[in-house]
Amino acid sequence: MIDKLDSVLAQFNEERVYNNGEYYRLKKFDDDTYELEVSISGACGTFESHPAIKFKIIPESNQVLFLSYRDVVVNPMKHFKPESEAELDFVKLAFEQLLDKCDQVKSSC
């Protein structure tokens, strides 16, 4: 996962990349904290997260700490800080899938 994450960190930034009806973006908050987001067009020019995962990279251990998960397109929408093991497993799987999608998007550009 870290290799794919390094690739995404190198290839994406705050400028949205459009691909097949979705927008991909990596927002950087500080040296180690990011949000990886896939969004779709919403009403009146907004972007709706589907999903957005905020995370922190722990440099000493090269581990990823998940800070929040947001998906406003699903019903009911989800917005939470992963705390339980089930929530962490859910976010980790979603994050790995998101990394794969980002990798495919950059490969097709």
Per-region residue spans from a language model:
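Short hydrophobic/aromatic-rich beta-strand segments that constitute the beta-sheet cores
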Residues: 35-36, 64-68
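Short, solvent-exposed aromatic-acidic interface loops
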Residues: 41, 66-78
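Compositionally biased, intrinsically disordered linkers/stalks adjacent to structured regions
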Residues: 75-109
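A short, structured loop/turn motif at beta-sheet edges
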Residues: 26-31, 56-63
